[in-house]
């Protein structure tokens, strides 16, 4: 029996709250600050976001990887997540690095922000675990100012458990990402960037582009995807 929306999100949030303290220690999730991969991520995010300073929302921020890079680049950043444990880790990282970003509880499908208040919305390693992606992208578009952009960075999983290592040890991933949960996450099963492009176009964005981050993939110590990360972008007219 398919799970209802609330039960799906509860399982997802519980999983990421459990793994939050160890999330950054896995190189497939977050590269070390001094690594060539981290430098490459800074360059990529700088290229993908509008000129600074811009109002940026990082959806599914987790431990704040993208938010903190955007802050470092000079943007005004809000990162939202439903895992309080992940947000706590993000705040620790911000304090440790002397960076300013606002981290708050927020549902990715219906972010708690005013309409027409943002210049960019970005998410990384998140689309695959987003319920109701079609609804979410429509709602994201409403938050953007004219000419605001959406940036979706993700990839296609090697298999349904590789991305969660080492957290998957002991079957933790399968206990929370049950068959019923997976059925409610359509992008988890996608294997084509064309589907991602169709998602962004279907939400009403124009000038939709899809590219890859092959340069970062080559530098990654333990990339979570067999193929390079993809980047889908779109503009609100």
What residue spans do the PLM features occupy?
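Nucleotide donor/acceptor-binding cores
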Residues: 53-55, 116
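Class I SAM-dependent methyltransferase SAM/SAH-binding core
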Residues: 55-59, 63-110
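Core SAM-dependent methyltransferase catalytic element
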Residues: 220-237
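Conserved class I S-adenosyl-L-methionine
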Residues: 1-52, 168, 214
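A short SAM/SAH-binding and catalytic strip from SAM-dependent methyltransferases
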Residues: 120-133
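C-terminal alpha-helical "lid/dimerization" subdomain adjacent to the S-adenosyl-L-methionine
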Residues: 10, 153-222
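A short acidic, Gly/Pro-enriched loop at the edge of an enzyme's catalytic core
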Residues: 109-121
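A short glycine-rich, Lys/Arg-flanked "PGG" loop and its adjoining helix->strand segment in the class I
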Residues: 134-146
